[in-house]
């Protein structure tokens, strides 16, 4: 029973737990690390930050931008198709599809309905839109979707 008493027990501690710690040496080891970290942060602060621009668009915005680009491209191609002696002024396009808000799709739809009429001769004018020779809205939509498919899936 004598072995169970705490007076008789001696614990043996590992050497790293019993060795006296030199506080000066421990501080000198930590100090250079802190200086390196601080120097690294100063170096980061002196360099110009790298700016990356990320554009995020949903599918509807991508289609709007693509259609706007196609419409602009078609407007640029049509003056070359028209005879040089009869230049037709293109209708003003107030908003760029790149800067317009998603809520302004009515302007894009209006301009989309105008571009097929640009190829008509001056004698036809806007009244020709109601004639049986004009394209149906389904054909116009299919034509626009054809360009979108061509851009995104080829």
From Swiss-Prot:
Biased composition (Low complexity): 95-105
Motif (XLM): 144-154
Pfam families named among the record's database cross-references: MRI
UniProt keyword list: Acetylation, Chromosome, Cytoplasm, DNA damage, DNA repair, Nucleus
Residue ranges, annotated region (Disordered): 77-144
Localization, UniProt: Cytoplasm; Nucleus; Chromosome
Record keyword Signal present: no
Motif KBM: where in chain: 1-21
GO biological process: double-strand break repair via nonhomologous end joining; immunoglobulin V(D)J recombination; negative regulation of double-strand break repair via nonhomologous end joining
Positions bearing N-acetylmethionine: 1
GO cellular component term, pick one: site of double-strand break
Domain topic, free-text comment: The KBM (Ku-binding motif) mediates interaction with XRCC5/Ku80 and XRCC6/Ku70 and recruitment to DNA damage sites. The XLM (XLF-like motif) mediates interaction with DNA damage response proteins TRIM28/KAP1, ATM and members of the MRN complex (MRE11, NBN and RAD50).
UniProt function note: Cell-cycle-specific regulator of classical non-homologous end joining (NHEJ) of DNA double-strand break (DSB) repair, which can act both as an activator or inhibitor of NHEJ, depending on the cell cycle phase. Acts as a regulator of DNA repair pathway choice by specifically inhibiting classical NHEJ during the S and G2 phases, thereby promoting error-free repair by homologous recombination during cell cycle phases when sister chromatids are present.
Complex and partners: Interacts (via KBM motif) with XRCC5/Ku80 and XRCC6/Ku70 heterodimer. Interacts (via XLF motif) with TRIM28/KAP1, ATM, MRE11, NBN and RAD50. Interacts with splicing factor SF3B1. Interacts with ERCC6L2; this interaction is DNA independent.
Name of the protein this chain belongs to: Cell cycle regulator of non-homologous end joining
Organism: Cricetulus griseus
The encoding gene: CYREN
